Amino acid sequence: MSDNKEDSTVDNSNSTEEVPLPTRFEVELEFVQSLANIPYVTYLLTQQQLLWKDPKFKNYLKYLEYWCEPPYAQCIVYPNALFILKLLNGFMEKATVNEDGLLDGLEDLPKVIQLQGNQWMNEMVERWAN
C-alpha cells in the first residue's frame, strides 16, 4: 500500500493569529493560587533579587487581598493560598523601609515559611478531607 493519505492535521505555524495574552484577572488568580505551593513561596523569599523586600511587592500583596472576598474567593481552587497571602501580609505590615529602600524586619519570614510550610499544607489537606 502506498502512503498517499492526506494529513488531516492543520499546520498553524504560518498562522497570523496571535494567542491572546492572559487577562489581569487570570494572571493575578494564577499568582495568588501559586502561594499555596510552599516550595514556590520559599523560592520567592530566598531568591537573590530580594523581590520580597521591595515595598512595591508589599503593596502588590496587600492589593491582592481582594481575592479573599466574594465573588473572587470562589475562583480560588487552593484556599490555603489565601492563608499564605494573609500570613505574608501580616509579616509585611510590621516591616519598615530602610535607607536603601528595602523592607526591614522580614529576616525571619523565609525561616518561618520553610519550617512551618509542610505543617500548613498538612492542615490544609485535613481541612479538605473533613
Curated annotation (Swiss-Prot):
GO terms for biological process: DNA repair; meiotic gene conversion; positive regulation of transcription elongation by RNA polymerase II; positive regulation of transcription initiation by RNA polymerase II; RNA polymerase II preinitiation complex assembly. GO terms for cellular component: core mediator complex; mediator complex. Keywords: Activator, Nucleus, Transcription, Transcription regulation. GO terms for molecular function: transcription coactivator activity. It is found in: Nucleus. Pfam families: Med31 (PF05669). Component of the Mediator complex. Belongs to the Mediator complex subunit 31 family. Component of the Mediator complex, a coactivator involved in the regulated transcription of nearly all RNA polymerase II-dependent genes. Mediator functions as a bridge to convey information from gene-specific regulatory proteins to the basal RNA polymerase II transcription machinery. Mediator is recruited to promoters by direct interactions with regulatory proteins and serves as a scaffold for the assembly of a functional preinitiation complex with RNA polymerase II and the general transcription factors. This is Mediator of RNA polymerase II transcription subunit 31. It comes from Candida glabrata (strain ATCC 2001 / BCRC 20586 / JCM 3761 / NBRC 0622 / NRRL Y-65 / CBS 138) (Yeast). The gene is SOH1.
